[in-house]
């Protein structure tokens, strides 16, 4: 919607306060400061939609937003509705991840097995199989004061897990 405004209206004439109350919709890049007992995590919730292009841009933003010294983790869910290109495109996102500054990568879903197998060995975390393993990752396995980006298609259910934390 911003691109429509930019392309069709004189940007200089727009009210400067127009976007002050704009909030990022849940599961589309929203940031959750999660605390349970003494553990604190910053979770970037990108769990509503995923395709190779949105994945690449979300990962680039995640990389550039946080310092290189920060502990950064990635939870990747299946990208769905890719048809016959699904395997190839899940492999392709491994290339983006391998170039990133992420410390460890965890995957969830059968299709992300293709991604996991193409990751550099030193950043491979674990392939997670169910909601309990995801909650254990968030509540127990990740170090305190770390950053986690969750990216996957809506129907993987990752967004429901994150929203219910």
What kind of feature is each model-predicted range?
Residues 2-165:
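ATP-dependent carboxylate-amine ligase
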